Amino acid sequence: MYEGVRELRENARVTSEFKSDYQELVDEISELLGVPATLENRDFELIAFGAYDSEGDLDPSALDPVRTRSILTRRSTTAVRTWFEGFGITRATGPVRIPPTPEAGVYRGRICLPVRHRGVVLGYVWLLDSDPGPTDAQLAAAMGVAGRIGALLADEAQAGAGLGRELRAVLVAEGGWQRDMAVAELRTALGARADVPHTLVCVAPWPSADPDDAPSPRTVPHATALCALPWGAAGHSLAVLVRLRSTDTATPALTAAARLLRDAEEARSAAARGAGARTAAAVAAGSAGPVPGAQACAAGVGGARTGLAELGAVWQEASAAARAALAEPRFGPVARWADIGPYRLLTALPPQAPQDPAVAPLLTPAHHELARTAEVYLDHAGQAGRTATALGIHRQTLYYRLSRVEQLTGLDLDDGEDRLLLHMALKGARLA
């Protein structure tokens, strides 16, 4: 294994030049073997595929469910990936034949050509097997092309890893000359793309601390670069630089955020399955402990900017929006900075800011119902009728609860400043 293996997975981008090269190489393999070829990265995400070219009728078995889904959605499911990896393709250095298995959705056999570079598997070329299939000489020639694909994937990934490092340097820089230098380096790396409208997406908490588990920007719509950043005391978040068509629309960022949340959910599900298997083994051994619950994640989208100078501020906005989405389900799972209202101010407070002493008694578990009543009352601008309807209670019950809130806190709910203090304290408690 060589030292760059982690970088090969950490971040990658596809320029039009890279994309064209991949397509040409896949077409070359298709011509060599006379069958359509498909190229996927090691995470089973589609990169390129050869068109079906035949003078006869299209064989329906060439479009079995697994192949169709891969082409239409540009990726395979975790179950499909696990099934194919069971044939040893991650360790193989030569062609691997996989028999047809209709119950798995594989109606036609496959030939897998591992795509390697310096001993590291970076992807796979998939061929539909036939009878008679390709000769050994044809497969050897195709493996030569696969080696060229591996070199291209390595170059692409290393270029993308550099972008990820430059982005991270900008987002963690203290400011002043350090920030200026980091921005200049990122601007140089991006070239002409530096001056287009951008925003940042924050996905938090990202379910894995392993950089190898970060997605490739190729698979994230409109993503230019991504990197992992700390989140809270021990967690991690994912920062994604997204290019926009204009500063007036956030649609590309919302699309990217939705895709990343799906990736995060898949990672959480896989982790939960692994934890379940470990727990079952521990139970069998008589040493089972508590099973940690999987933590939900959310995404935040910062405001749009042209150029890179304000990326630090955009990251603060995206992080704040993600925190708001985690605190308030009505914002999530994807929240925009422009839409989070008072949380734009509340998220600027230190994460461990102490509770106001007047409101602290109300925030204990014993008074959860009173706190909820007060929050809904203040959310409805102190209108008793709307509040009672929202809570599904009688007005007299509402008045009784509000009087109890005043007794506990010493605050006067007829006083505007007291209302403001209570409202902000209740909202801030959601961020804790």
Residue map of PLM features:
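Intrinsic-disorder-associated interaction segments
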Residues: F18, T73, E156, G160, ...
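Glycine-rich, aromatic-bearing surface loops/beta-hairpins
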Residues: A159, E166-L190
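Helix N-terminus capping/helix-initiation residues
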Residues: T77-V80, E174-G175, D356-P357
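Short, hinge-like loop/turn segments at secondary-structure boundaries
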Residues: E55-D57, G175, Q352-A353
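Alpha-helical/coil-rich non-catalytic "connector" segments in signaling and regulatory proteins
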Residues: M1-A169, A275-A288, H368, T373, ...
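Cytosolic nucleotide-utilizing catalytic cores of signal-transduction proteins
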Residues: A182, L186-A432
